[in-house]
């Protein structure tokens, strides 16, 4: 078993050793605290079938917990919408917020293992930034992650992945993610 006190995730070590220096050189930061870093990664699964069967939210939360390595929180409806047959406080999905070492581990697994397993994968879109240095992407299948057993999946559920950075602009955030080998198309 690995000694937990001396273990540093691969991307966290890469950030400390090479990414910070490359970002400082590229953008000309005067202070080390100006250099953008990863803040958090939020994984979200919306379960549309939860209106008919609330047990599907529980299985989605279990799968998301396996993928993230930490317990998923069930999200509830804020208010009732009669057209969608949604009632207030009805479970609709689940989410996980990753920070610290788990965040770097997940990003490493996403880039090196999960994204290459996506069918017809050419790269991720480079225009999915929000204007404040955060990147959002979606996956249509949860079994691109090795933690999910393909045979035990009842229903194919997609997920949203939001990568939040401390970057002020989209260009800085894109450069940061490129340093982590995020495979952008454009």
Curated annotation (Swiss-Prot):
InterPro entries found in the cross-reference section: Ribosomal_uL5 (IPR002132), Ribosomal_uL5_bac-type (IPR020930), Ribosomal_uL5_C (IPR031309), Ribosomal_uL5_CS (IPR020929), Ribosomal_uL5_dom_sf (IPR022803), Ribosomal_uL5_N (IPR031310)
This protein's record includes keyword Metal-binding: no
GO cellular component: ribonucleoprotein complex; ribosome
GO molecular function, one term: tRNA binding
A single GO BP: translation
Protein task: This is one of the proteins that bind and probably mediate the attachment of the 5S RNA into the large ribosomal subunit, where it forms part of the central protuberance. In the 70S ribosome it contacts protein S13 of the 30S subunit (bridge B1b), connecting the 2 subunits; this bridge is implicated in subunit movement. Contacts the P site tRNA; the 5S rRNA and some of its associated proteins might help stabilize positioning of ribosome-bound tRNAs.
Subunit description: Part of the 50S ribosomal subunit; part of the 5S rRNA/L5/L18/L25 subcomplex. Contacts the 5S rRNA and the P site tRNA. Forms a bridge to the 30S subunit in the 70S ribosome.
Protein name: Large ribosomal subunit protein uL5
Organism per entry: Cereibacter sphaeroides (strain ATCC 17023 / DSM 158 / JCM 6121 / CCUG 31486 / LMG 2827 / NBRC 12203 / NCIMB 8253 / ATH 2.4.1.)
């Amino acid at each position: 078993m690995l000694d937990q006190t001396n273990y540093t995730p691969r991307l966290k070590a890469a950030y400390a050793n090479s990414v910070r220096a490359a970002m400082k050189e590229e953008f000309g930061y005067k202070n080390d605290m100006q250099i953008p870093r990863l803040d958090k990664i939020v994984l979200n699964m919306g379960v549309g079938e939860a209106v008919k069967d609330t047990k599907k939210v529980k299985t989605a939360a279990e799968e998301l917990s396996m993928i993230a390595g930490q317990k998923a929180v069930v999200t509830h409806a804020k208010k009732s919408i009669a057209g969608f047959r949604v009632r207030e406080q009805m479970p609709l999905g689940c989410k996980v917020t990753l920070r610290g070492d788990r965040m770097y581990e997940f990003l490493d697994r996403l880039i090196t293992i999960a994204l290459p397993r996506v069918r017809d994968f050419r790269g991720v879109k480079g225009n999915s930034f929000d204007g404040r240095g955060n990147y959002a992407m979606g996956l249509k299948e949860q079994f691109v992650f090795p933690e999910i057993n393909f045979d035990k999946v009842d229903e194919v559920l997609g997920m949203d992945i939001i990568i939040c950075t401390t970057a002020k602009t989209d260009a800085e955030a894109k450069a940061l993610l490129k340093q982590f080998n995020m495979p952008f198309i454009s």
